[in-house]
Amino acid sequence: DEGAGRVYLTEDVLRGLLADAPADVRFGQRTGDTHTVGACAGGTVRWPGNALYLVDGAQRRTLTADDFARLTRLVDRLDNVQGMVGVSVGDFEPTVRDFCTLRLMAQHTGKHLRPVITSLSGVDAVMEMTDVLAAGRDDSPISFGYSVVSPLRWTATALQLIQRTSGRGLPFMFNAEPLAGGTSPVTLAGSLAQAHAETLSGIAIGQALEPGRPCLYNAGFAHTLDMKSAVALGGSAEVFLMATASADLARRWSLPCSSWVSSEGMTEDAQAAAEKSMGLTLHTQAGVNLVWGMGQLESQMSISLEQLVIDDEIAAQVDRLQRGITVDDEHLARQVLLADPAERGDLLAHEHT
């Protein structure tokens, strides 16, 4: 409908476009490692998220270039955070911010890089750096993404970014960020239905421009609107439910999926620990392939070095839960249980221990 500025996709057209989308995505690192996750490969990787502020003691403040360098170096040393995401660095003018933050990330970590594009004015420079960093590699160390404007609107900026990053095999994450009761229906099922349509439409655009491009289904950036405070909640049970359900929706289309875990906690307190623990556990158990939000607080507005370390430890515990209990002859400790009772009296010295 050209007059209304609206595009309709039939089910046959949609299925035809999405048939080319890979079930798995490879996140390369400049260290040489690659993390492959998706509908077939399974697995979960975790990144921080875009933030406006740094939590500094009992205060928050605008992020500086030095702050971001410290955050990036910390991420580089954490075992359970597999990539770094750009943030809003106050030292840089908006026209060069995207390029400058990508340069800082590349200087301070060898892990996967996810620049956050805030202006098309810097895309050409970002793409030149991307070509240098990804030269000769099948598993790009850089990926991109953009969010739909709910309800059901892909902006000119989003469409240009999808187009200008096409043709290189770079992973692209298509984000729906429904706000239940605000920009999407107040019911969880209604919000999910809208987010599902938004995400699939984005992936269809990506596949039309570059068939076979690795695309991530991300209806897991969902929020609920607190009707008393007008705050977009990121750590509520309803948000966790929508994110875990979105993983099931992605698997129906054999697509890798993503989500975001955050907390309404303003600092590294018990509320943040509870909400981050619940979120990271549920999202991982639901099979979400890429979880954003490591270190984030205040409904995703802020990030904390201390919370990053705490979340890394939570992620280690979650991964241990995922591995479960190994049951075989060795782990059943047959040689210990069936040994002479006298030998069982000193298990610390036993070879099995």
Where are these regions (language model features)?
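Amphipathic, soluble alpha/beta structural segments
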Residues: 68-96, 195-197, 295-297, 336-352
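Catalytic alpha/beta active-site cores
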Residues: 4-176, 180-185, 189
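Short, charged low-complexity intrinsically disordered segments located at boundaries
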Residues: 43-47, 98-106, 133-137, 159, ...
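Short, structured secondary-structure boundary patches
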Residues: 3-29, 136-138, 189-199, 237-239, ...
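Generic secondary-structure signature for well-ordered alpha-helical cores
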Residues: 19, 23, 73-80, 107-114, ...
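Glycine-rich anion/phosphate-binding loop at the beta-strand->alpha-helix junction
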Residues: 146-311
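Helix N-terminus capping/helix-initiation residues
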Residues: 10, 64, 119, 187, ...
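Catalytic-core signal marking the mid-to-C-terminal active-site face
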Residues: 1, 306-353
